[in-house]
């Protein structure tokens, strides 16, 4: 799978692309990531990528010409999505990551800066607008790295034990259960005895109960989704 990231700050991705899961996935050619700087596609001597907002307003806006030129310079695989990160975009979640990982060969991600990008980019170039959440960040590189990580880890060959992906939070609308490691006692806090019992049926039941309780207490919205899904799956 190919990822193209349009960014004014390619160095932002230097360390993340060389370490941990992403670094291994790229080294094993599970995916390929290409960084493109829109500034390289400017035509003026100052390499300007931003300008004032029509109608007045605070701050600067990224110009459309370098962004269009940068995207049009890229290879176009058959199943491609061009993503722009904006507050009004679709919230990123696990179903979205699965959708992108399973149905597309190429993701082009446009990282905004300043007050955003010219609306014509969203109207005539972008195929999907995405949002990391209801808060403001300084740049689009942060959601781009999040999307990159979330999608690549679902691609075959990235995670060693595929079964572990199916048991993670959000895969079944439920949060993950509590997990413990050695020592069995730390500062008087004990690992639940059921986890040390060796009875796998009891352990599985305890984990499911903990998932349901934790989701109900901490994420009532997800709990309601899980209830609805459980109702529809009953015979």
From Swiss-Prot:
Keywords noted in UniProt: Cytoplasm, Methyltransferase, S-adenosyl-L-methionine, Transferase, tRNA processing
Molecular function via GO: tRNA (guanine(37)-N1)-methyltransferase activity
Name of a matching Pfam family: tRNA_m1G_MT
Compartment annotation: Cytoplasm
Coiled coil (residue ranges): none
Organism superkingdom: Bacteria
Enzymatic reactions: guanosine(37) in tRNA + S-adenosyl-L-methionine = N(1)-methylguanosine(37) in tRNA + S-adenosyl-L-homocysteine + H(+)
Binding site for S-adenosyl-L-methionine: 112, 132-137
GO biological process, one term: tRNA N1-guanine methylation
GO cellular component, as recorded: cytosol
EC number: 2.1.1.228
Presence of the UniProt keyword Protein transport in the record: no
Main subcellular localisation: cytoplasm
NCBIfam families given in the database record: PRK00026.1 (NF000648), trmD (TIGR00088)
Family under the similarity heading: Belongs to the RNA methyltransferase TrmD family.
Assembly with partners or alone: Homodimer.
Function: Specifically methylates guanosine-37 in various tRNAs.
Protein name listed in UniProt: tRNA (guanine-N(1)-)-methyltransferase
The gene coding this protein: trmD
